[in-house]
Each structure stands twice: as C-alpha cells, then as structure tokens.
From Swiss-Prot:
It comes from Mycolicibacterium vanbaalenii (strain DSM 7251 / JCM 13017 / BCRC 16820 / KCTC 9966 / NRRL B-24157 / PYR-1) (Mycobacterium vanbaalenii). Its EC number is 7.1.1.-. It is a peripheral membrane protein. It comes from the Bacteria. Belongs to the complex I 49 kDa subunit family. One of its GO terms (cellular component) is plasma membrane. NDH-1 is composed of 14 different subunits. Subunits NuoB, C, D, E, F, and G constitute the peripheral sector of the complex. Pfam families: Complex1_49kDa. This is NADH-quinone oxidoreductase subunit D. Signal peptide: none annotated. SUPFAM superfamilies: HydB/Nqo4-like (SSF56762).
C-alpha cells in the first residue's frame, strides 16, 4: 500500500476515565500504520507537567508522533458558583482561578461589573493606581514562578531557588497590603478593599531597590548558560501563523515578534499614562519566551516605580467610589492583632444611625443591583489575554460569568509545539507556555 493509499489516522478525543479507550484506539492505530508506536500517559501526577495536566503522547522511539492534552482534573465549578453569590462576593471566587495571578482575575471581574454599572470613569484615581501596582508586582511574581518551575523541570535547581526566593519578597508586600499572601480578594467593584497601610510604600521602595540586582543574578545564571540554551533554543517552535490560527496570546505570541499587549492596544486602569515598552523577540521558541519574561519583569519594575510616585502624591485620597448605594466599606485596616480598626469601624456603623445600619446590612447581605446587559472585558495577564464575558439579568447576582483564560487557550499549542520533537522537549514546550491548571479547569 502506498502512502497515498493509507487510511487516515484516527483522531481520539480524550476526557477523564477513558484510558481503556485510548489504549484500544492506539493499538488499532498501530496496527494500521507501519512502525512501532506506543502511547505514553504523562501525568496528571507528574513533576514536570505544571500541575494536574495530562499529556497523551503517541511516540515512535523517542519521537512524538501525536500529542494531546487531557484537562479537567482541577475543575472547581467557580463560574457556576458565581451565579449563587452577589456581585461583590464573586471576587473571593475568581481570585482562586489562576492562583498565581489573582489580582488579574479580580481586576478583570471588577472592570466588567463597573462597566455594567456605568461607573468606569468614576473609579478614584488612587484606586486605579493601586490596582496597577498590585498587578505589576503580581506579574513579576508570576514570571518568577514560571522561570523557577521551568528551571526545575530542566534540572536547573539554582533557578528554582532564586525564583522562589525573590517571589517571597513580593508575597510579603501582598501580605502587608491585603493581609494575605495569595487569594487576596483585595480589588472590589468600585475600587479596592482598603487603602495602603503606612508601612506599605517603604516596603515597596525597598523591594524596588533589591529586585533589579536579584533579576540580574538570574540573568547571569541562565542567559548564556550553554545547557540552558541547548535545552530551550529551537524547542517548542511556534511562529506567528500558528499563534494566529490557535488564538495564542501573551509571551508565546510576543516571541514571534508581534508587539500585542492589551495594556497598549486596549488600555485600562490608566495604563496609557504609564511609560513602559512592550517586549518582543523573533526566535519563536522557548528561549525567546524566557527572554521576554525576564525583560517584562524589568518593565513591570518601571511601572511600579511610577505607581509609587503617584501614590506618594495622593495620600489620603479616596480608594472607593462615593456612591453609598454601590460602595462597600473601604476604610478597614488590618492590624498586628488581626483586627486593626475593625472594632471602631463596626461601632461607627452601628452607632451612626439605625437607617445607616439597615442600609449597611442590606448592602452586604443582598448586594448591589447591576443593570441588565452583557460585557466583555480583557486584561493582559502574565500568560496572555484574560477576558471576562459577563451577563446580568438586573439582579443582585451574576446570570453568567465566563472567563477566557489564556492558559486554556494556549494549551492548544501543545500539539503544534511537540509533534515531531523529542519526548524530553515536550517538558520544555509546556514550561514555555506556563499554564496554570487552576485557570484552565476553573
């Protein structure tokens, strides 16, 4: 039988609880085609698959003939749960989706709610600056994890230690400002949960002094490292045509030379007023994506420095909209005792007037009413375009909230990056995408 007469290869759609069907299909496929092929089930419990990601690899020798992703092992039903909570409570759910970039989840959600309410232009400037500062610090911490886990998977353990060490500095800032290291729920519809504590800006300034030097240490370790370049250059190749066909965004897209960044293309939170550059590369491979993430961290430091200057000039300015029908209390402070000024704040609410207490009770228990309609809002997360399609029926709860998570979309590129390459290079390709399974499965 000639090549043109061979039957087409069978396409297997993989879900959960289907290993028997995959094996049966693989055996039938192997019988129909020449060569010796086996199916390797990499994950979902594997140290190199960025969480509970399952890769179904059909290999011939050391060459990957077919690669497919199996997802859903971290499904939490967050989007469905949002339909049973009021609009403000939804922030505590979405922050847990992509758990390495919680502030981007929160900001996208709040921008959608504010657009439905028609209050986008009423958000206090100080609140927008705080949002930008937190997102850019979060971008740095997320990229540090990407480099740390990617280095660990390729055997560069020093990169892992350095990445997680610097990330701890940023998480300490998050803890000072929000009270939590992760899952912060700090950004709220109308502004932020509370103003910065007095010790926050000095801590951020110290961080900005230390981070550039620490990042240069990591660059000195990896940029010209012979082994690192051998494992990443030319690996996981995906050009601009492939990115456009698959809807790929973020560092993977910018590694093809296209300067697509929503902070410049569709500015939000006042990003058009900040001075920074969109980092690109033209290598289209894993090494190019590594370089982009390193350089993006330096650009984020530039933005945070500008945020600090603006915050120093606006001390005492409001951080929540003034409309009391929409605004949750935003003047609570977290103290060393875990309470801060909450006893005094509660006494003020309860002792001001009975009408004020009733209004506060209804605002918190029932929530705000959002006019009927639907919007799509997107922000530039560390992994690409993070979009929210939000639908309201005019009630106090969302009718539907759907997240377009970049990790989910970018995983489509696994087959294009891996097929025809070596099994060991699949690890590099997935690490260069930097998927977070909490965002993929939701």
């Amino acid at each position: 039988m000639t090549t043109s007469q061979q039957p087409p290869e069978r396409v297997v759609v993989v879900g959960g609880q289907d290993w028997d069907q995959v094996v049966a299909a693989a055996r039938q496929n192997a019988a129909e085609h020449a060569g010796e092929r086996i199916v390797v089930n990499m994950g979902p419990q594997h140290p190199s698959t960025h969480g509970v990601l399952r890769l179904i690899l059909e290999i011939e020798g050391e060459i990957i003939v077919e690669a497919r992703c199996g997802i859903g092992y971290l499904h939490t039903g967050i989007e469905k749960n949002l339909e049973f909570r009021n609009w403000t409570q939804g922030v505590t759910f979405v922050t847990r989706m992509d758990y390495l970039s919680p502030f981007f989840n929160e900001t996208a959600y709040c921008l959608g709610v504010e657009k439905l309410l028609g209050i986008t232009d009423a958000i206090p400037e100080r609140a927008s600056v705080i949002r930008v500062m937190m997102m850019e610090l979060n971008r740095i911490s997320s990229h540090l994890v990407a480099l740390a886990t990617g280095g660990m998977e390729l055997g560069a353990m020093t990169a892992m230690f350095l990445g997680f060490r610097e990330r701890e500095l940023i998480l300490s800032v998050f803890e000072t400002i929000t009270g939590l290291r992760m899952n912060n729920a700090y950004i709220r519809p109308g502004g932020v949960a509370a103003d910065l504590p007095d010790e926050a800006l000095p801590q951020v300034r110290d961080l900005l002094t230390l981070l550039p030097k620490r990042l240069r240490d990591m660059e000195d370790l990896l940029n010209e490292n012979y082994i690192w370049k051998a494992r990443t250059q030319g690996i996981g190749y995906l050009d601009l045509t492939g990115c456009m066909a698959l809807g790929i965004t973020g560092p993977v897209l910018r590694s093809t030379g296209l300067p697509h960044d929503l902070r410049k293309a569709q500015p939000y939170c006042g990003y058009e007023t900040y001075d920074f550059d969109v980092v690109t590369d033209d290598q289209c491979d894993s090494y190019g994506r590594y370089l982009i993430r390193v350089k993006e961290m330096h650009q984020s430091i530039r933005i945070v420095e500008q945020c600090v200057q603006r915050l120093e000039r606006s001390v005492g300015a409001p951080v929540m909209i003034t409309d009391k029908k929409l605004a949750w209390p935003a003047d609570l402070k977290v103290g060393p005792d875990g309470l801060g000024n909450s006893p005094e704040h509660i006494a003020k609410i309860m002792g001001h007037s009975m009408e004020g207490l009733i209004h506060h009770f209804k605002l918190v228990t029932e929530g705000i009413r959002v006019p009927a309609g639907q919007v799509y809002v997107a922000v530039e997360s560390p992994r690409g375009e993070l979009g929210v399609h939000m639908v309201s029926d005019g009630g106090t709860r969302p009718y539907r909230v759907h997240y377009r998570d970049p990790s989910f979309t970018n995983l489509q590129a696994v087959a294009a990056m891996c097929e025809g390459g070596m099994v060991a290079d699949a690890i590099t390709a997935v690490a260069s995408i930097d998927p977070v399974m909490g965002g993929v499965d939701r």
